[in-house]
Amino acid sequence: MSRSVFSTLRPVIGQKTTLAPFALSLRHASSSSSPFSTPTEPTSFHTQPSHSTPTGPLPLTWPSYLSLRRQRRLWSTLTSVPTTFLGLFLGGGYFASLEADPSQLIFGVEPMFVYGGATLGCMALGYLIGPSVGATLFSLTHPSIARGNPAPLEVMDREFYHRIRKNRADPRFQSVQNIVPDFYGEKIVSLSTYRRWLRDQAVYKRKAMHGVPGEDL
């Protein structure tokens, strides 16, 4: 009697064991399709470092930064005038005090011409160091934005030039008759000029791409 009962119950036990994996698969499918579930394993094992700019809030707004950038450029331009004349006066005064003997040539050239060229060189040197002096004076008069690690103005400069490099036209397509307009964005002083700069870059890209063979692109 017990043997016959065991033989009748064996198919039922076998059926339960075969349904168990199917139930587990249904449970796994329902849990994975749930919108609130979180995967236990990462989808990718090889993650590459991101080279994009930081997405955090910028220390300055763009209108205020462009206004400060315009002021700094103005300071650099204005200080070039006194430094140029200072180099001219210092160089001219020094070389004028030297005794020039026409019979003694300097590299085969009369001393008067050499001293005159050196005076012009001092004037050019004063013109070149003018923007650096102006930028230094601007930083001293605006310590809240020019100091720090990193300084707010430095962060904005980095972000600004990143956008310039990203949106400007490819210089490989330029020619003597068709030069990239404002390649470094030096004329950008406001949001309106920045939008105009973007339009100019787009127009240049269309002109540069027009008529270029496909194999050269």
Swiss-Prot record:
Q: Where in the cell is it found?
A: Mitochondrion inner membrane
> What are the record keywords, sorted?
Membrane, Mitochondrion, Mitochondrion inner membrane, Protein transport, Transit peptide, Translocation, Transmembrane, Transmembrane helix, Transport
Ranges annotated as spanning the membrane: 78-98, 126-146
- Keyword Cell wall biogenesis/degradation annotated: no
Which residue stretches belong to region Disordered?
A: 33-56
InterPro entries annotated for this entry? Pam17 (IPR013875)
Membrane topology is: Multi-pass membrane protein
What this protein is reported to do is described as:
Component of the PAM complex, a complex required for the translocation of transit peptide-containing proteins from the inner membrane into the mitochondrial matrix in an ATP-dependent manner.
Protein name stated in the entry: Presequence translocated-associated motor subunit PAM17, mitochondrial
Whichever gene encodes this chain, its name is PAM17
